[in-house]
Amino acid sequence: MKNLFILLLFLNFSAHAQWVELLNGRDLTGWKTSENPNSFQVKDGELVVAGPRGHLFYDGPVGNHSFTNFEVKALVKTYPGANSGLYVCTAFLENNWPSQGYEIQVNNSHTDWRRTASLYGIVDTAEKLVHDEEWFELYVKVEGNHITTKINGRTVVDFVEPAGKTEGRRIQPGTIAIQAHDPKSRIAYKSVQVKLN
């Protein structure tokens, strides 16, 4: 028990000092699935997201899976027609789309016109900055009431949340989640890292 406490303390401290990898490349330790667990598989060191709607919520020890001011970067590859998303400031929900936080869109060729790094339904971009079947870095920073998204270092969204927003889609302490959108979508995540500020 003492060793577990020391490990958790170290992970929490080290997350404040550097980037911490949340995917281990072997299994889904530290993550919790909703709706359709089979939509999330680890294959050849990558998280493969393919199947019916579901969400994979980070539920591990880093930051006690509740982040306030933080950065996330993920290495992502989409396949033709795929749609996914990376939620921030969210909370576990057993069914349906997460009702808290914001979704950062992952979509380079799906019929939904909102493209990768859009702050879904809030600040959307139709510009396609990366292509299917190539790895790219998706970066998100949440600080105070400010969200920034980038693709391969290029800023896509620079959003300041209006004062007084109290419900649903708002910046609040929470976890991150990866979306399985539909059975025709296939996305791979090679790395998901977080840095607590």
Question: Residue ranges of each PLM-predicted region?
Answer:
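Carbohydrate-interacting regions of secretory-pathway proteins
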Residues: 17-197
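Sec-dependent N-terminal signal peptides
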Residues: 3-13
